[in-house]
């Protein structure tokens, strides 16, 4: 059993008012710096925040309502048994280095993603592929081991974007895709810049340039917005300051739901966490609402599954691990565990560092000591 405590984080975004809408460049604030820029060889969400749908594209893409739409594949056919997908590719598409996109690139990408030594973070998306066959430069056939109606959906993920063999070796630091923006520069620790690709096959980008500024410190993020150094800040890291922005006519504050989750994961291979009673005791020792209030200033929702509350399939299971410190103590006693010290590793985001302190205090209240270790994102992954 792998036990988790989960919260959904509220999506917080700040932007300047419509008075600046006429500009054709934008500077975005970004909390976490990507460890690399190859979405097919890294798990960090920060990678896709920069490159997905900007630099790279897949065979399919997600529409605003979640529908699967054509992208580099203009259409596809499915065999009657649901096992063979034939993708009809767009022609006249080029990568940013001038290389022509064709069916060989699709085969290379899918074979690379499902290879035994693949570094793809979502390798399971490609596990059902049996063969990939190039029919002609504009047609590729993917045969699955079993029928899978989700396959076009899987191909819209950031982990399934199409890369070229000519440039793949340098994707981590010099990404080359087919999207509406091309990579310009990465000043590590400071910013990443992309610019409009004039040879784009689809509707040209309205912006000529976009800069992602790395600002991990909440105080610095607040100051950058107030000074006008950034135009917008998705995933804003200082929720305690939102009231100030809300009353300032220069800014627009958007608070929405998200698929993002805050998870406390436990290593259930390591004693005494291999004992389900100990894991349950930890779950009952923690008040998730305290984390939401203390770390995110009320922005968030306790959940008991990996579905967000806005998902139509969501079932509220928070009661299975409700906050109950007395029950937590009883479970520890039943497990015969006392004088327990756990190591709590926390990644860089503010919610994690703040939330970790709250968790440590609540575990201490039931007799569990914690040693907090702050780690960088690359170590965490």
Where are these regions (language model features)?
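Gly/Pro-rich hinge or "lid" segments in bacterial periplasmic/extracellular proteins
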Residues: 67, 147, 153-205, 209, ...
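Structural transition elements
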Residues: 267, 297, 301-334, 351-354
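Surface-exposed binding/hinge segments that line
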Residues: 88, 122-165
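N-terminal lobe/hinge region of extracytoplasmic solute-binding protein
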Residues: 29-80, 111, 176-178
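Ligand/substrate-recognition segments at binding pockets and active sites
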Residues: 28, 188, 312, 329-381
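Alpha-helical secondary-structure segments
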Residues: 27, 102-109, 137-143, 179-180, ...
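Aromatic- and charge-enriched surface segment that lines or borders ligand/interaction sites
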Residues: 74-119, 135, 141, 272
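Ligand-site clamp/hinge motif
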Residues: 169, 197-243, 360-361, 369-371
């Amino acid at each position: 059993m792998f036990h988790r405590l989960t919260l959904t984080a509220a999506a917080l975004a700040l932007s300047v008012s419509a008075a600046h809408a006429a500009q054709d460049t934008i500077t975005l604030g970004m909390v976490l710096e990507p460890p690399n820029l190859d979405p097919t060889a890294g798990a960090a969400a920060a990678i896709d925040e920069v490159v997905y749908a900007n630099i790279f594209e897949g065979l399919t893409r997600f529409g605003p309502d979640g529908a699967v739409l054509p992208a580099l594949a203009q259409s596809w056919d499915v065999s009657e048994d649901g096992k063979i997908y034939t993708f009809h590719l767009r022609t006249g598409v080029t990568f940013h280095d001038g290389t022509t996109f064709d069916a060989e690139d699709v085969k290379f990408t899918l074979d690379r993603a499902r290879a035994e030594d693949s570094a793809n973070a979502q390798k399971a998306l490609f596990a059902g592929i049996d063969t990939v066959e190039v029919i002609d430069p504009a047609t590729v056939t993917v045969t699955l081991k079993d029928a899978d109606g989700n396959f076009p959906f899987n191909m819209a993920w950031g982990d399934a974007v199409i890369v070229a063999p000519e440039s793949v070796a340098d994707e981590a630091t010099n990404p080359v895709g087919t999207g509406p923006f091309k990579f310009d520069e990465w000043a590590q620790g400071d910013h990443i810049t992309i610019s409009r690709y004039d040879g784009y096959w689809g509707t040209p980008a309205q912006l000529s340039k976009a800069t992602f500024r790395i600002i991990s410190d909440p105080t610095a993020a607040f100051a950058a917005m107030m000074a006008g150094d950034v135009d917008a800040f998705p995933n804003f890291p200082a929720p305690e300051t939102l009231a100030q922005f809300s009353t300032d006519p220069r800014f627009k504050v958007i608070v929405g739901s998200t698929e993002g989750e805050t998870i406390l994961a436990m290593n259930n291979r390591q004693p005494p966490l291999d004992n389900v009673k100990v894991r349950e005791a930890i779950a009952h020792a923690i008040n998730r609402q305290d984390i939401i209030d203390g770390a995110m200033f009320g922005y968030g929702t306790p959940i008991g599954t990996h579905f967000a509350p806005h998902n139509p399939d969501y079932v509220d299971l928070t009661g299975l691990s409700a906050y109950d410190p007395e029950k937590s103590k009883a479970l520890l006693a039943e497990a015969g565990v006392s004088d327990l010290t756990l190591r709590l590793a926390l990644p860089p985001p503010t919610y994690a560092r703040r939330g970790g302190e709250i968790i440590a205090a609540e575990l201490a209240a039931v007799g569990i000591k914690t040693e907090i270790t702050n780690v960088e994102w690359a170590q965490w992954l």
